[in-house]
């Protein structure tokens, strides 16, 4: 029976992974549709759409899905999505920013507020925590793009502000308004990036213990599980040993 049990566990895990991938594709498709509707349906002529398509490809989203999302924006029956930012505090006074694309503002606000309340946090007003973050461009390259020195040199030449390199790859940070220019310059030097996006980068991080970290990670997981939520950012910090323990749980 042990073998049967193991098979069931593997299939359950695969099912969970497939569900996560399906939800991710759905969110990527929504961003593509919104980007295509906001400008031209040609990625070459629409920087936001180009980035959305590039990020979808980096996540192995099928070409048919990408094309369908672009075409959806051109139809008369295309949903109208609104970009909304929610801000609040998780347990321990940790600041959280939630970015959403929604066709029903009331539904999304209700879901986000409920998630904060259940976690022991509180949803605040727009602007209540965003001053603790910087809006920046984040360009990610795989380790195969080159060693740290090569990537650092290319990033400086491109006008980036910061580079973080490790065995997993390279994360390049640039000013929000420079993301298009920096991305193009990096492509010439290093090829196409793995992902390009704008993010909210914490100016400082709040250290939290294992119990608080568990509550915060649970809140983030609940928020990210919502179909309307695109991104979640938080300014907390956990030591490596605690994070490894929580990841293994």
Curated annotation (Swiss-Prot):
Cross-referenced Pfam families: TACO1_YebC_N, Transcrip_reg
GO terms under cellular component: cytosol
Keywords: Cytoplasm, DNA-binding, Transcription, Transcription regulation
PANTHER family: TRANSCRIPTIONAL REGULATORY PROTEIN YEBC-RELATED, TRANSLATIONAL ACTIVATOR OF CYTOCHROME C OXIDASE 1
Any GO BP: regulation of DNA-templated transcription
Annotated HAMAP family: Transcrip_reg_TACO1
Family: Belongs to the TACO1 family.
UniProt xrefs under Gene3D superfamilies: 1.10.10.200, 3.30.70.980
Stated name of the protein: Probable transcriptional regulatory protein Meso_3192
Molecular function terms, GO-annotated: DNA binding
Subcellular location: Cytoplasm
